[in-house]
Amino acid sequence: MDINLKILRYNPEIDRKGHWEEYVLDADPDERILDLLHKVKWFDDGSLAFRRSCAHGVCGSDAMVVNGENMLACQVLVKEVSNPIKIEPIRGLPVIKDLVVNMDSFFDSYKKVMPYLINEEEPGERERLQSPEDRDRFEDTTKCILCAACTTS
């Protein structure tokens, strides 16, 4: 099936602001958005910049805006989004190039909130016990993959 992919492109060396470029790709409905970006980079335009690493939703490096929603490109199938597919960098962070953003301010803020357990007692001879209620207080934060998708939406 033909997919119209619209990507917000920006190269600071030649562009004053971002502009949309369109690509028509043959895609399977079960391909991921990340697969489409690879097709563009490998076969249409090698200058396209985007982050990716594990391709399994673990690293969070491929967070971007797809059809107006923050998501991981490796976790979204073509059949789950409408055609044309519009892709842009996550908002609220400076764009380095195309879909790559500077994450420094995100990580600086993350460090300031000290997202780890702090205990001022010396370690004992045995493990520290944790109740289910204590664990529930921070359960959701243990699932964070540091992609910035939730904080930039």
Question: What is each of the regions a protein language model found here?
Answer:
Residues M1-T152:
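Signature of N-terminal electron-transfer/Fe-S-associated modules in redox systems
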